[in-house]
């Protein structure tokens, strides 16, 4: 079997590795560097990738960087009159990595394992896979960056049971994953993150500071000058790196622009203390996901045996100090933050080819998946942090008599109401035979494959007819949306709870009306007409209340109707008992049906444990 290369397709830098002699090795690029800037430039119809494109960015406006931030969206870059999608730009980077890997190996490479941030959603993962396909690579597996890092770290430690926390702060994304290592099994317990936080944001803080200082001294806004801005960007990145090793750095940019009196130069001394002050809020944003990952794994900081740092931004002293303070231990320094992810991807490639044995990788899905059910509620089928690959089925029913079709609205997110979550796709199961509500059995199945990509299927168990969809949303979730989901879930917990209670109240009331209609038909001629009219009046009042949004009134009318129907049932059984006693007293009456039980609008059947929910 041909070799499978491991690729870390990063926001700022990318790397490629291969398994040789049982060890993962980084493949250097043609310039001799072990990582390649994720930068693409277009000039006179020619494409430039990596360091060459990055160096030319100052004079070439047709230069694209940090395209990974737009994966899974409809974003387009227009270059020389042509639109490029994020997948196409990423494919150009992948093609370059593929070409120099082939030169190094002396053979054609057509298979790869590509890493993505753990918090990437379905659309972003699909976009990454598509980029690989465009680049001429068969993507054997999409794996999470922290998981790949753990694989590289733990390959020679498979005999020791330990719990590790991977802290991954890259150029554009931030992830925290907690894994358990032991007996060759790498099991992810939880993952959390922020897809809008990375080294680029630290650079921007320095750029904004330099722009403000220059404007204060010279009255000129450099942010309006594209060439000056590119020079500032390069200088900010260099200053950030310098301040990881020294406490002060000099930023010197001669001839940055020109004023009325002639050329102007930028000279600023940036201290580590000032840098820490500028970026304090960014460092603080790493704390909440870290705590969330621990909480989801049901662990405390003291349960963590090792902390692994991934991504160049983890070299920032303030970041390391925050980790140490939060987790109470020094981070492990035995792995290279820039290379460890690609190496882990190469090891996963070795697992697939069979070159690496006795290693099992168990990853998780970062966000909950479900469908919209009556009342606008999201019914979750697969909870976040569920080990993948996985599949889950539940059985639902129709909400109306003779309903000919059901719409399946597939959702991803943590909020209880459907409207507050992200739509992954919609499809319809049609041609359901006419039947009363609640009779048809519609089985909805979710499958998440080893790459974290979702397939949803709906099947009418009565007819065997089915429909399915592979989620290939072109827009996907933006970084902002995915971060907003979890934050909104926490900030709006009370409102969510109230909305869900109201939806359930409305559903229960609607079900009660349906049950009462059925009961009144059964009682026809068996109880006094006046009692029936009383029940019908209460039912009509509840139906009227259901047209509005006064949930207190709906609750009151529901309780009132419930009480009337219960009394009717009691009288019916008392009457039947009296008749039997008069006729000689037949014993062994069936237990009365409890019409006080109010079901939801659908029936769920959990295939895993065969229990009704």
Curated annotation (Swiss-Prot):
Disulfide pairings: none
ATP-binding recorded as keyword: yes
Protein induction: By stress conditions e.g. heat shock.
UniProtKB keywords: ATP-binding, Chaperone, Nucleotide-binding, Phosphoprotein, Stress response
Biological process according to GO: chaperone cofactor-dependent protein refolding; protein refolding
Annotated Acidic residues bias: 596-613
Protein family according to the UniProt entry: Belongs to the heat shock protein 70 family.
Protein's UniProt name: Chaperone protein DnaK
UniProt source species: Listeria monocytogenes serovar 1/2a (strain ATCC BAA-679 / EGD-e)
């Amino acid at each position: 079997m041909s070799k499978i290369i491991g690729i870390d397709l990063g926001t700022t830098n990318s790397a490629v590795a291969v398994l040789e002699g049982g060890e993962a090795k980084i493949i250097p690029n043609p310039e001799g560097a072990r990582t390649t800037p994720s930068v693409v430039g277009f000039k006179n119809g020619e494409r430039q990738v990596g360091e060459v494109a990055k160096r030319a960015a100052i004079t070439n406006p047709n230069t694209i960087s940090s395209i990974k931030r737009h994966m899974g969206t409809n974003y387009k870059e227009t270059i020389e009159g042509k639109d490029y999608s994020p997948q196409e730009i990423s494919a150009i980077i992948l093609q370059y990595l593929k070409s120099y890997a082939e030169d190094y190996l002396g053979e054609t490479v057509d298979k790869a394992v590509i890493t993505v941030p753990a918090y990437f959603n379905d659309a972003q993962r699909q976009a990454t896979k598509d980029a690989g396909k465009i680049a001429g690579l068969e993507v054997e597996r999409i794996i999470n960056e922290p998981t790949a890092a753990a694989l590289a770290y733990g390959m020679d430690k498979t005999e020791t049971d330990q719990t590790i926390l991977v802290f991954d702060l890259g150029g554009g994304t931030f992830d925290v994953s907690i894994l358990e290592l032991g007996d060759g099994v790498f099991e992810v317990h939880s993952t959390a993150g922020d897809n809008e936080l990375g080294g680029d944001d630290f650079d921007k803080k320095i750029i904004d500071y330099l722009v403000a200082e220059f404007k204060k001294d010279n009255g000129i806004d450099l942010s309006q000058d594209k060439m000056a801005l590119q020079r500032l960007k390069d200088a900010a990145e260099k200053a950030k790196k310098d301040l990881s090793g020294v406490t002060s750095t000099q930023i010197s940019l001669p001839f940055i622009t020109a004023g009325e009196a002639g050329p102007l130069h930028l000279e600023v001394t940036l201290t580590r203390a000032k840098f820490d002050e500028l970026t304090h809020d960014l460092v603080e944003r790493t704390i909440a996901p870290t705590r969330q990952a621990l909480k989801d794994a049901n662990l405390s900081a003291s349960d963590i045996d090792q902390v692994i740092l991934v991504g160049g931004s983890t070299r920032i002293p303030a970041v390391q100090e925050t980790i140490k303070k939060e987790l109470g231990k020094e981070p492990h320094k035995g792995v290279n933050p820039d290379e460890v992810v690609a190496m882990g991807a190469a090891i996963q490639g070795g697992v697939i080819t069979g070159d690496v044995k006795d290693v099992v990788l168990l990853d998780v899905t970062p966000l909950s998946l479900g469908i919209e059910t009556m009342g606008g509620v999201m019914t979750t089928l697969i909870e976040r942090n569920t080990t993948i690959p996985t599949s889950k089925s539940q059985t639902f029913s129709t909400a109306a008599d003779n309903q000919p079709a059901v719409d399946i609205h597939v959702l991803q997110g943590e909020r209880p109401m459907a409207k507050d979550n992200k739509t992954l796709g919609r499809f319809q199961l049609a041609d359901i035979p006419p039947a009363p509500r609640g009779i048809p059995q519609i089985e909805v199945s979710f499958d998440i494959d080893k790459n974290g990509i979702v397939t949803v299927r709906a099947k009418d168990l009565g007819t065997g007819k089915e429909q399915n969809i592979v989620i290939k949303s072109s827009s996907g979730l933006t970084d902002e949306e995915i971060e907003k989901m979890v934050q909104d879930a926490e900030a709006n917990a009370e409102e969510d709870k109230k909305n869900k209670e109201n939806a359930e109240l409305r559903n229960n009331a609607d079900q009660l009306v349906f049950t009462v209609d059925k009961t009144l038909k059964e009682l026809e001629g068996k109880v006094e007409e006046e009692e029936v009219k009383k029940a019908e009046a209460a039912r009509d009042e509840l139906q009227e209340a259901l047209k509005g949004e006064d949930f207190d009134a709906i609750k009151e009318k529901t309780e009132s109707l419930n009480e009337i129907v219960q009394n009717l049932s009691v009288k019916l059984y008392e009457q039947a008992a009296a008749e039997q006693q008069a006729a000689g007293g037949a014993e062994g009456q069936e237990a009365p049906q409890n019409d006080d039980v109010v079901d939801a609008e659908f029936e769920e059947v959990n295939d895993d444990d065969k229990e009704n929910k």
